[in-house]
Curated annotation (Swiss-Prot):
SUPFAM superfamilies for the chain: Adenine nucleotide alpha hydrolases-like
Gene3D superfamilies attached to this UniProt entry: HUPs
Species name: Erythrobacter litoralis (strain HTCC2594)
Cofactor notes: Binds 1 zinc ion per subunit.
Cofactor needs: Zn(2+)
Keyword Secreted part of the UniProt annotation: no
EC class: ligase
Entry protein name: 7-cyano-7-deazaguanine synthase
Binding site for Zn(2+): 193, 203, 206, 209
Length: 239
């Protein structure tokens, strides 16, 4: 199917594994991918390079990058001078939580979608193997869909309202790793680490690295990223 004959979908593409798989799922479902990447002042800016690579590799119809610098607000290890924790995934909301990030990002993606003529929005949030961020939960996604249709011209005047797709929401990281392989994606195209080492290597120890490594290990698949030899062990990894 030619790209110009496919229905457009706005994809929030961070450059991470989840957003890459989400974009490919949208494409598999017949959508033309209009990807939006947001530079929010994150310390792991390497993910922006990954987003560009992913958009090129999957043949996105359009890829737009915008700045929404959240560093001035502070309050997160990803945008402030706060150490990224390396002690494992806990039960509390960690300091890597960026205040209202997905609320901000989905608002921007909705604006991008409306301007692009897209009414389907895809986001790669996950509520199983994740760090406990409140803006990844199903009830947030459901409530935002209502808000998007109340707050936009498209939602008020058109018969086809915005629909928010979160295809990974109820998948484990192992499921997502398997989807990556099934869709023919290279895991090394994506980036997950919050605290990159010199030479742009993943640390292997932050929450995001641990969850990703755990997922590939449980799926029995090799991850294409090069983790340091002294990274904390993950059961089943390299088995």
């Amino acid at each position: 199917m030619a790209a110009n004959s496919r229905k457009a979908a706005a994809i929030l593409l961070s450059g991470g594994l989840d957003s890459m798989v989400t974009a490919a799922i949208a494409q598999e479902q017949g959508y033309a991918v209009h990807a939006l990447t947001i530079d929010y002042g994150q310390r792991h800016k390497v993910e922006l390079q990954s987003a560009r690579l992913i958009a090129a590799k999957i043949g996105a119809e359009r890829h737009v990058e915008i700045e929404a610098d959240l560093r001035a607000l502070g309050g997160s290890a990803l945008t402030d001078d706060i150490d990224v924790p390396k002690c494992g995934v806990g039960n509390d909301i960690p300091v890597t939580y960026v205040p209202a990030r997905n609320l901000v990002f989905l608002s921007l993606t909705t604006a991008f979608a409306e301007a692009s003529g897209a009414r389907d929005i895809f986001i790669g949030v996950n509520a199983l193997d994740y760090s406990g961020y409140p803006d990844c939960r199903p009830e947030f996604i459901e409530s935002f869909a209502v808000t998007a249709n109340l707050a936009t011209k498209a939602g008020v005047e058109e018969s086809a309202p915005f629909k928010i797709h979160a295809p990974l929401q109820h998948m484990t990281k192992a499921d997502i790793a398997r989807e990556c392989a099934r869709l023919g994606l290279e895991s090394a195209w994506s980036w997950s680490c919050y605290d990159p080492l010199p030479g742009l290597k993943p640390c292997g120890a932050c929450d995001s690295c641990r969850l990703r490594r755990k997922g590939f290990a449980e799926a029995g698949l090799a991850d294409g990223l090069d983790y340091p030899a002294d990274a904390p062990p993950i059961q089943g990894e390299n088995a």
